[in-house]
From Swiss-Prot:
<feature type="active site" description="Proton donor">
    <location>
        <position position="154"/>
    </location>
</feature>
<comment type="similarity">
    <text>Belongs to the short-chain dehydrogenases/reductases (SDR) family.</text>
</comment>
<keyword id="KW-0560">Oxidoreductase</keyword>
<protein>
    <recommendedName>
        <fullName>Short-chain dehydrogenase chry4</fullName>
        <ecNumber>1.1.1.-</ecNumber>
    </recommendedName>
</protein>
<feature type="binding site">
    <location>
        <position position="185"/>
    </location>
    <ligand>
        <name>NADP(+)</name>
    </ligand>
</feature>
<feature type="active site" description="Lowers pKa of active site Tyr">
    <location>
        <position position="158"/>
    </location>
</feature>
<feature type="binding site">
    <location>
        <position position="37"/>
    </location>
    <ligand>
        <name>NADP(+)</name>
    </ligand>
</feature>
<feature type="binding site">
    <location>
        <position position="187"/>
    </location>
    <ligand>
        <name>NADP(+)</name>
    </ligand>
</feature>
<feature type="binding site">
    <location>
        <position position="81"/>
    </location>
    <ligand>
        <name>NADP(+)</name>
    </ligand>
</feature>
<feature type="binding site">
    <location>
        <position position="55"/>
    </location>
    <ligand>
        <name>NADP(+)</name>
    </ligand>
</feature>
<dbReference type="Pfam" id="PF00106">
    <property type="entry name" value="adh_short"/>
</dbReference>
<comment type="function">
    <text>Short-chain dehydrogenase; part of the gene cluster that mediates the biosynthesis of the yellow pigment chrysogine. Pyruvic acid and anthranilic acid are likely substrates for the nonribosomal peptide synthetase chry1/NRPS14, with pyruvic acid adenylated by the first A domain and anthranilic acid by the second. If pyruvic acid and anthranilic acid are merged and released from chry1/NRPS14 by hydrolysis, a subsequent amidation would lead to 2-pyruvoylaminobenzamide. This process is probably catalyzed by the amidotransferase chry2 using glutamine as amino donor.</text>
</comment>
<comment type="pathway">
    <text>Pigment biosynthesis.</text>
</comment>
<feature type="binding site">
    <location>
        <position position="154"/>
    </location>
    <ligand>
        <name>NADP(+)</name>
    </ligand>
</feature>
<dbReference type="InterPro" id="IPR036291">
    <property type="entry name" value="NAD(P)-bd_dom_sf"/>
</dbReference>
<feature type="binding site">
    <location>
        <position position="158"/>
    </location>
    <ligand>
        <name>NADP(+)</name>
    </ligand>
</feature>
<dbReference type="InterPro" id="IPR002347">
    <property type="entry name" value="SDR_fam"/>
</dbReference>
Amino acid sequence: MARILITGSTDGFGFEAARQLIERKHQVYLHARNQERADEVKTKLPGAAGVLIADLTTVAETRKLADEANAIGTFDAVILNAGLLYGPFRKSDLGVPASVFVNLVSPYIFAALLNPPKRLIFIASVLHHEADTSLKDIFWLERGEKEWKDFPAYCDAKFHVVLLVNAIARRFKDTSVIAVHPGYVPTKLAGQDAPGKMEDGIETYVMLAEGDYDTSLTGVYFDPKKERAQPHALTADLDKQEAVVKACEELTGIKLPSP
C-alpha cells in the first residue's frame, strides 16, 4: 500500500485517479481549494485517507499545504495535478496571473517545501511544444492583463514545468521526478469536446503513482499511453532549467537545494 497525495483531486483526472487508487487499497490524500469542495469530494470518495484544503493561487496557502503534507509523513507518490487554463483574468497574491501561478509557481513552491517523496509527478502537456521558449517575462508581470492570452500562457507554463522537472531531478537524488502529458481529453480544463480518452491518461497516473515503471528514471517525460515521449529539445538546456529555478526563487523567496 502506497501513501499518495494528488492535488486538484475534486474532479477530472485527479478525482478519477484518486478513485481508482483508493479502490486498489492505497492510502490516498485528496486536495481541494476550499471547504465546500472538500466536503463534496469526501462524500464521493469516503475511502480517502483525508482531504487537504488550500487555494493554490497564494504563497501562504501553498506553504500551508506543504506543511500539512509533511506532517502526515513522507509520501510514496505526489501528483501535482492542479491546473488552470481558461477563465477570467485574475491575479495571485504576488501579482502573477492565477493560471501561471497554479501551473508553475505553486508546484515549484510545493516541491521546494515538501519532504521529497519517492515519486514526484508534475503535469506537463504536449502543448509545451507550442511555447515561447525565450523565457522572457515568465510570469507575465511585464505584459499584464492588457496583453494576457490564456492559451499561450498555458503553453509557456508547461514548457517551464518540463524545465523545472529536469532541474528538480538533479537535486532530489532519491526521487523519481517525472513530467507527464495526461492527454487532451474531456475535462473541465480541456472542455467536453476534447477527443482523447480519459482512461489512457488515468492509467498513466496510476502507473506512476504505484511506481509500476523503472523508478530509476528521473527527469523524463511520459505520454498518455504509459510510454516515454520526447519533450521539446530545449528542455534539456541546463541554462534554461536553472533560469526557471532562479526566476521562481526570486519571485517567491523560496529556494530549492543546490544541485
